[in-house]
C-alpha cells in the first residue's frame, strides 16, 4: 500500500501525459456531459429538496481539489513544497476558491468575476494542460488538476442553468478589475518574497 501511495502522490521521470489523447479528452467530455445533464434537468434540480446539497457538493469538490495540490506537495517533499514556489496567486486557484463561495452563496458578483476568468484564462489550461506532462491518469495530480478546472465550469454553468445567473456588460468590468487586483497582489508578493513565483 505504501508503494502505491508513493507512486500515486508522485510524478513520473518521463512524460506520462500527452495532449489530444484519450487522457486529455475524457475529462473535457465528462465536463460537457455534466453541462448537458444540468441543462436537461435544471427545473428538477431547482425544485429538488437536495438542490442545496448539490451546490455544497460542487463547492466541496472545488475546495478539496485545490487543497489536494498542497497536500501532495507536503506528502512528497521531493516535489518541492517550498511555499515561495507555490503561492496561491494564480487565476485558476482563485477561480476555484471564488467558485466555491459563489455556488454556496449564489453570489452574482463572484459569478461575474469567475465567468470571464474561466472563459479567458482557464480555457487555455483545459486545451493545453502542461502541468500534467509527468502526471498521467494514474497520478493524484492528474485528478486534482481536472477536478479543479472542470468543476469551476460546472459551478458556473450550474448557476446559469439552475439559478438563471447571466453575465452582463458590467460583469466584464468587474472581472477585469478583480484580475488587476490579483495582478497587483501577485506583483507585490513577488517583490516582497525573494524567489517567489
Model regions: which residues?
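Hydrophobic transmembrane alpha-helical segments in integral membrane proteins
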Residues: 2-32
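Membrane-embedded alpha-helical segments of multi-pass membrane proteins
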Residues: 25-33, 88-96, 114, 127, ...
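Alpha-helical transmembrane segments in multipass membrane proteins, preferentially the mid-helix core
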Residues: 35-40, 98-99, 151-170
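Membrane-interface helix-boundary motifs at transmembrane edges
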Residues: 41-55, 104-111, 162-173
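Juxtamembrane "helix-exit" motif on the non-cytosolic side of transmembrane helices
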Residues: 42, 67-78, 127-136
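A glycine-rich, hydrophobic loop/mini-helix early in the fold
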Residues: 48-103
Amino acid at each position: 500500500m505504501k508503494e502505491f501511495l508513493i507512486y500515486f502522490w508522485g510524478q513520473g521521470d518521463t512524460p506520462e501525459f500527452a495532449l489530444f489523447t484519450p487522457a486529455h479528452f475524457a475529462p473535457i467530455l465528462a465536463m460537457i456531459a455534466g453541462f448537458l445533464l444540468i441543462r436537461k434537468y435544471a427545473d428538477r434540480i431547482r425544485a429538488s429538496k437536495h438542490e442545496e446539497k448539490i451546490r455544497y457538493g460542487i463547492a466541496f469538490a472545488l475546495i478539496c481539489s485545490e487543497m489536494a495540490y498542497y497536500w501532495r506537495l507536503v506528502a512528497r517533499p521531493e516535489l518541492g513544497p517550498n511555499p515561495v514556489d507555490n503561492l496561491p496567486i494564480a487565476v485558476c486557484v482563485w477561480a476555484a476558491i471564488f467558485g466555491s463561495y459563489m455556488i454556496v452563496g449564489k453570489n452574482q458578483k463572484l459569478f461575474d468575476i469567475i465567468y470571464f476568468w474561466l472563459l479567458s484564462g482557464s480555457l487555455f489550461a483545459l486545451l493545453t494542460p502542461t502541468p500534467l506532462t509527468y502526471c498521467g491518469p494514474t497520478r493524484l495530480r492528474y485528478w486534482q488538476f481536472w477536478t479543479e478546472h472542470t468543476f469551476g465550469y460546472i459551478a458556473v454553468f450550474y448557476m446559469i442553468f439552475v439559478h438563471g445567473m447571466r453575465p452582463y456588460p458590467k460583469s466584464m468590468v468587474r472581472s477585469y478589475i478583480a484580475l488587476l487586483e490579483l495582478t497587483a497582489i501577485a506583483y507585490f508578493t513577488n517583490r516582497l518574497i525573494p524567489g517567489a513565483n
